[in-house]
From Swiss-Prot:
It catalyses: an N-acylsphing-4-enine + UDP-alpha-D-glucose = a beta-D-glucosyl-(1<->1')-N-acylsphing-4-enine + UDP + H(+); UDP-alpha-D-xylose + an N-acylsphing-4-enine = a beta-D-xylosyl-(1<->1')-N-acylsphing-4-enine + UDP + H(+); N-(9Z-octadecenoyl)-sphing-4-enine + UDP-alpha-D-xylose = beta-D-xylosyl-(1<->1')-N-(9Z-octadecenoyl)-sphing-4-enine + UDP + H(+). A motif (D1) lies at residue 92. Keywords: Developmental protein, Glycosyltransferase, Golgi apparatus, Lipid biosynthesis, Lipid metabolism, Membrane, Sphingolipid metabolism, Transferase, Transmembrane, Transmembrane helix. A motif (D3) lies at residue 236. Residues 1-10, 216-287, 329-348 are lumenal. It holds the Pfam family Glyco_transf_21. GO terms for biological process: glucosylceramide biosynthetic process; glycosphingolipid catabolic process. A motif ((Q/R)XXRW) lies at residues 272-276. It comes from Xenopus laevis (African clawed frog). This is Ceramide glucosyltransferase-B.
Length: 394
């Protein structure tokens, strides 16, 4: 009986610690968002002295927003940059989109590469290899096809690339679009994701997504170049790790990495979250414990039980109050990341928030159940440590 009492006491203490850690993350991410994101920073170097940048753009297929997204890169206000458009297949409709933009902007230093180069199992790396091999500038900007930018986005990122910084990344967010699926994505990327992403980076944990990353080519080459990361599906994590291992710091851009895909749905969002969870579990096994207890409903139950055990407070009353406080702070976080008025009502936010939170256990269990993922044109079996093998159809 004494052992059981001790175990329950330990669990209650854990619940209290969890409460303080999670609310520290809430406050930290909100304060950082208010102080750093969507702020016009003073130029750290003269415009004409900004370093040259080689933009690597991996392309696969076409959606309704692709040409508009790509065009924003051709309209960048930056002194020296090149655009290296990389398409895997000759018959990909993205080829025609690229040729149209190359014809429309002849003064922009841009080239189209078709065919890729097979160096590993990662299709994105294979696609980018021809562009990477001819990149002429010291800074490499890898930016996904669904991202759109402002004319001064690259200037903002380059100004963050100070002497001791080896990687500048943008906080992923989602552009205003129509439909509930768009609202669901915006709520996730404006609440749960930035809370973890910002808290990790501010406290020194290297957390980077590869949607928009500006890196020093010299450092990547020291790590073996892009080919060194072709064995991984989550190449962005291992690129960031390689840069950090060499003593370089990271910096977050003041502008978000604005996702603007023209193809989106609730099922696509759910599949994407499951794929990401699978990658995290295989790269960082501690995720199996940390991830579920960092979500609102599970955390509220654990903390509510701890409050009942220690203070004899009603579990359900505490659970409801804790969820309500979480809901309100998430809304504050969302408004900060948005940097302006939201494109949907508070009722839409409430529904999307509840559905997103309700999905979390299903997403996590689905990720545990099946270690294979489908990405781009292939299926892959994940291994512990982050490597993967391609599953070939027999």
């Amino acid at each position: 009986m004494a052992v059981l009492d001790l175990a329950l006491q330990g669990l209650a203490i854990f619940g209290c610690i969890l409460f303080f850690v999670l609310w520290f993350m809430h406050f930290l991410s909100i304060v950082y968002t208010r102080l750093h994101l969507n702020k016009k920073v003073s130029d750290k170097q003269p415009y004409s002295k900004l370093p040259g940048v080689s933009l690597l753009k991996p392309l696969k297929g076409v959606d309704s927003n692709l040409i508009n997204n790509l065009e924003t890169f051709f309209e960048l206000d930056y002194p020296k940059f090149e655009i290296l458009l990389c398409v895997q297949d000759l018959d990909d409709p993205a080829v025609d989109v690229c040729k149209k933009l190359l014809g429309k902007y002849p003064s922009v230093d841009a080239k189209l590469f078709i065919g890729g180069k097979k160096v590993g199992i990662n299709p994105k790396i294979n696609n980018l290899m021809p562009g990477y091999e001819v990149a002429k500038y010291d800074l490499i900007w890898i930016c996904d096809s669904g991202i759109k930018v402002k004319p001064d986005t690259l200037t903002d990122m380059a100004n963050q690339m100070t002497e001791k910084v080896g990687l500048v990344h943008g906080l992923p967010y989602v552009a205003d679009r129509q439909g509930f699926a768009a609202t669901l994505e915006q709520v996730y990327f404006g609440t749960s994701h930035p809370r973890s992403y910002i808290s990790a980076n501010v406290t020194g944990i290297k957390c980077v997504t590869g949607m928009s990353c500006l890196m020093r080519k010299e450092v990547l080459d020291q790590a073996g170049g892009l080919i060194a990361f072709a064995q991984y599906i989550a190449e962005d994590y291992f690129m960031a790790k390689a840069i950090a291992d060499r003593g370089w710091k990271f910096s977050m851009a003041t502008q978000v990495a604005m996702q603007n895909s023209g193809c989106y749905s609730i099922s696509q969002f759910q599949s994407r979250m499951i794929r990401w969870a699978k990658l995290r579990i295989n790269m960082l096994p501690a995720t199996i414990i940390c991830e579920p207890i960092s979500e609102c409903f599970v955390a509220s139950l654990i903390i509510g039980w701890a409050a009942h055990h220690i203070f004899r407070w009603d579990i359900m009353v505490f659970f409801m109050c804790h969820c309500l406080a979480w809901f309100i702070f998430d809304y504050i976080q969302l408004r900060g990341v948005q940097g302006g008025p939201l494109n949907f009502s508070k009722l839409d936010y409430a529904v999307a928030w509840f559905i997103r939170e309700s999905m979390t256990i299903y997403i996590f269990l689905s990720a545990l159940w099946d270690p294979t993922i489908s990405w781009r044109t292939g299926r892959y079996r994940l291994r512990c440590g982050g490597t993967a093998e391609e599953i070939l159809d027999v």
